Amino acid sequence: MRDVQSEKDHRNIPINMVGIKGLKYPIIVMDRTNKRQHTIGTFNLFVDLPKDFRGTHMSRFVEVLDRHNMKVTPKNMESILDDMREALKATVAHVTVDFPYFIRKNAPISGIGSYSSYNCGFISTKNKEFDFILKVEVPVLTVCPCSKEISDRGAHNQRAMVNVQVRMNSLVWIEEIIEMVEDAASAPIFTLLKREDEKFITEVSYDNPRFVEDVSREVVLRFMNDPRISWYRVEVSSQESIHNHEAYACIEKGKSL
């Protein structure tokens, strides 16, 4: 049978990244409370392709992923990348995976429990060195300090999304990232609240107003004081309740204006 993919290509143009995108696959990730958590990952898997190869072997990406028995950890990601490079005779391999991560949270006053979902992901590359980034998206509540200052009654508040990316020297739990981000906001967000909880969150957030600038800086302060975190990028986007636009702030370690 003719192997078209392995034929020589004469256009003399290498390809930086080729592979499969948007593959949904069951995965197991580490969980601080329960040791492991089953979820669904959406994968992008790419390698480089030399200038004289016409095509890559798409089926091998799935074969490599399947061999790892659904385990997706920082350590195992490097093993997946190494296997991809070997199976596809590549120099560079890239894997990104996005997944929902669930945490059991208790309401602040009633103590009633419910699950909260967070969009998380890993970004990994292997060339000569292994690079791994953890990303976590955390919804929080913000109250506008300016609105509070100038108003006789109340202040406008809204949900804000904090998108965090970190490189680590040693393990930082997803739960720890979420806790640091929630602590930097006016108040955390819960899936289930009773009336006494709503009262508490409303009053706590009012007493702790935050601009997007405040939230981004407060998150970064916590990252700077954690020796396990070697690099970070923090983006805060506030869904302004009294405007038809969003407020935005971004801080990245090592990036100048």
From Swiss-Prot:
Per its record, how is this protein called by name? GTP cyclohydrolase FolE2
Against Pfam families, the record matches this protein to: GCHY-1
Species of origin:
Kosmotoga olearia (strain ATCC BAA-1733 / DSM 21960 / TBF 19.5.1)
Keywords of the record, alphabetical order, are: Hydrolase
Q: Name one GO molecular function term.
A: GTP cyclohydrolase I activity
As recorded in UniProt, its EC number(s) are 3.5.4.16
**Its GO biological process terms?**
tetrahydrofolate biosynthetic process
InterPro entries in the record, alphabetically?
GTP_cyclohydrolase_FolE2, GTP_cyclohydrolase_FolE2/MptA
Q: Which top-rank group of organisms is this from? A: Bacteria
Which positions does the site annotation May be catalytically important cover? 144
Q: What does this protein do?
A: Converts GTP to 7,8-dihydroneopterin triphosphate.
